[in-house]
């Protein structure tokens, strides 16, 4: 498996490049809206962020727990802990030390998004059992001739375009068994002997992350942001 730090090490260059390109594109696309206007400056100066903080102690406790969870994410490979356990553990500790009622916290969970992913993973599991994904993996290998570079390029391009229109998490969940099937194929596995890791996973991650920036529905974080924006107007 690939731990958090290994993934971050290999994906950081992509993040930096993507962020730089995105900033340039935003400045070009929204150049009219980004111009300074006197009324907007006055509105910003009139804002008082302290008034929005209802409980400063809760904010400090939450920040400490969030920081601890992020650090644990970085160390989970060394500690041999699953990231899901770390995340749930952080949530449990926060509930205990803040005294927030569990039902009150659960009320703010984005249940529609979670149920959507639950249903999606069930469908992906069913398609995998049917053998359709394995057949698709063999078709990809036939198309690329088993060449490592061509296979990585194909996975990256397909992932980038598909993730722009299909949320990158469900798309990645669908592609995982396909990449696994390609990796263990006898005609292709010999290409991976020179690597300490499977480069196909990074090709998939690169394409899915890149495509997730393409549209609002390209990433689950975008969907959550939209839901929160709709809730608070």
Which stretches of residues belong to each language-model region?
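Hydrophobic alpha-helical transmembrane segments
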Residues: 8-12, 16, 59, 63-67, ...
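Hydrophobic transmembrane alpha-helices of multi-pass, membrane-embedded glycosylation machinery
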Residues: 88-95, 178-179, 228
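Structural signal for the C-terminal ends of transmembrane alpha-helices
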Residues: 28-31, 75, 94-101, 127, ...
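Membrane-interface junctions of multi-pass transporters
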Residues: 47-49, 76-79, 96-151
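Membrane-interfacial helix-loop connectors
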Residues: 1-12, 110, 125-233
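Juxtamembrane and boundary regions of transmembrane helices in multi-pass small-molecule transporters
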Residues: 5-54, 64, 206, 210-233
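Alpha-helical transmembrane segments of multipass membrane proteins
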Residues: 17-22, 26, 69-72, 90, ...
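Flexible hinge motifs at transmembrane-helix junctions and intramembrane kinks/re-entrant loops
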Residues: 56, 60, 69-88, 96, ...
């Amino acid at each position: 498996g690939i731990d958090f730090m290994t993934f971050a090490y290999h994906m950081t260059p992509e993040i930096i490049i993507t962020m730089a390109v995105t900033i340039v594109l935003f400045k070009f696309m929204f150049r009219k809206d980004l111009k300074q206007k006197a009324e907007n400056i006055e509105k910003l100066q009139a804002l008082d962020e302290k008034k929005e903080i209802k409980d400063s102690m809760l904010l400090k406790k939450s920040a400490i727990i969030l920081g601890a969870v992020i650090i644990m994410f970085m160390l989970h490979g060394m500690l041999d802990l699953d990231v899901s356990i770390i995340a749930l553990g952080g949530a449990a500790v926060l509930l205990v030390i803040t005294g927030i009622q569990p039902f009150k916290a659960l009320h703010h969970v984005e249940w529609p998004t979670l149920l959507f992913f639950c249903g999606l993973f069930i469908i992906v599991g069913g398609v995998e059992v049917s053998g359709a994904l394995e057949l698709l993996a063999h078709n990809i290998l036939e198309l690329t001739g088993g060449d490592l570079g061509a296979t990585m390029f194909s996975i990256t391009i397909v992932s980038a375009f598909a993730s722009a229109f299909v949320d990158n998490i469900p798309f990645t969940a669908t592609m995982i068994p396909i990449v696994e099937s390609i990796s263990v194929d006898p005609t292709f596995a010999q290409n991976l002997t020179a690597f300490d890791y499977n480069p196909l996973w990074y090709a998939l991650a690169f394409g899915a992350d890149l495509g997730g920036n393409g549209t609002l529905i390209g990433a689950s974080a975008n969907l959550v942001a939209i839901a929160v924006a709709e809730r608070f107007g």
